[in-house]
């Protein structure tokens, strides 16, 4: 009778021993795994308060996510061992530069819009460019991660937008055809000096029919790149932020993991996508300095949204309300947040009120309140304020018949805009802006030229802004439409009032970038439908040297600018340009800078003219100083000629046929068996099933 009992005890102790050994082994393996596990890396800004970082005072939990930081490898961007320890920086890429010539039109000789006299305004310039680099990213990997995050319940924002593309996305991934329905382009980037990183955002658009100019939803994807343009994945930034639960008024820091989809709020109606394009479009980044002294990115975009507008019913004297839909311009702070999205929904909605989104504000101009569509504003920052932070952002609203907007960044009036300058006060603001529009942000030369030299080049009341607008030309000789960059130089002079002028503008610029056809199945057919090369951002502009050559009577510089572009709304490219600042210094009319041989006298004359409105030539004859449209029309005329010559060279002889969407889909399915298989599966197992249960 005791034997069975002993046997049970033996088994009991044997099991207990095995369990104990397994537990010890598991704990040992876990510790061994943790000892080799790489800690998450958090980059902190150079200006981050050392006292907070060193103390890890839990009393600062509202200001800094201390608990998260304790589990991370913390690195300042300028850490001496940064490159060796993290291996984030690659080798300097080898680039082949070649000379590129282009024509620039000045504004100093009035020609009365006579195109026959454009040669009086034209001069030749030269820079060096390298081969454009395709900053390709695997859409399969990006969207695979997106699907994984949605399934794991990560981020409420992703759950909200998932019905736009689920369950179709899973099938697209299985068949490896996501690039037939998803498109990544509109890459815009800025250099974050506090982190020694490039911050890039790009637009990822989804078209259920696979027609790239008819996406139902657009998302914004954020990435980080090191100084040599190697993407840095699985890294975190500690950024200055706000507390959305306290109405944005509480300063704090937040950790953002890269890469990621920015949770930008937008109004949408998933059940009504026909003809509606939801989400942020044409994103542009620009750097601003906030009231706390930190530089942070600001994102400019346009988006379709809903408003509830009050109106007066004259019959019963009761205020009524109607729904209004329009496409408007917005500002987004990627490092700041808000609760809910009533500012894009038009009203409070319990479904979204407790969700966290990026902070956005609509840009509003009273004179333009009734316009159904606003887009293609060109942003820039002026340093005319005595504050140490940016209170306003400026926009070129219209290039031809120049209009400049000034919009507040701060307080309750953030987003309110007024016209800071109008070339033609009689022009109705709602008039079409013309073929020259949008493009990159404009770079203030004060942010590029060393402070020690700036006052020797420009009087204190002048600012110069450089960027690349884009020309939109219809039926000019190559397909239905052509887009190309144009170099633009905007000058701001402060006299008794503020004056702006487009001092110089180039014709269309190819930068010798090879174009791919709009139709992905016919990439060599360059003049089918659209021929597109669009500039999106000046990522960086570095002047490595700037010296005065007294004997030669000129300034000599070395500089390099990085430009991002998109080809055929399908790519994100970057291009390096050397010598652009030197070409601007050497412009034939010498109207921008103080002449070397007359430095002191010119400064005195210019300053006196600004301080004495009666003697200021701007008040006497603005046309004589180039405040006109002469160089604009000359540049556009040259751009049309560029398009015509391009079409003559690259058009494939055939009868033009522009199909409707249904016909285009049918033709592509014949060419692409996988796409045909995809729609066949959807029709059999998804759409038919859905219709039965509807």
From Swiss-Prot:
It is an enzyme of class 2 (transferase). GO terms for molecular function: mannosyltransferase activity. One of its GO terms (biological process) is cell wall organization. The chain crosses the membrane at residues 12-29. Residues 30-694 are extracellular. Residues 1-11 are cytoplasmic. One of its GO terms (cellular component) is membrane. Keywords: Cell wall biogenesis/degradation, Glycoprotein, Glycosyltransferase, Membrane, Signal-anchor, Transferase, Transmembrane, Transmembrane helix. Glycans are attached at residues 101, 542. It is found in: Membrane. It is a single-pass type II membrane protein. Pfam families: BMT. Beta-mannosyltransferase involved in cell wall biosynthesis through beta-1,2-mannosylation of cell wall phosphopeptidomannan. Plays a role in the ability to produce hyphae in the presence of three bacterial species. Belongs to the BMT family. This is Beta-mannosyltransferase 8.
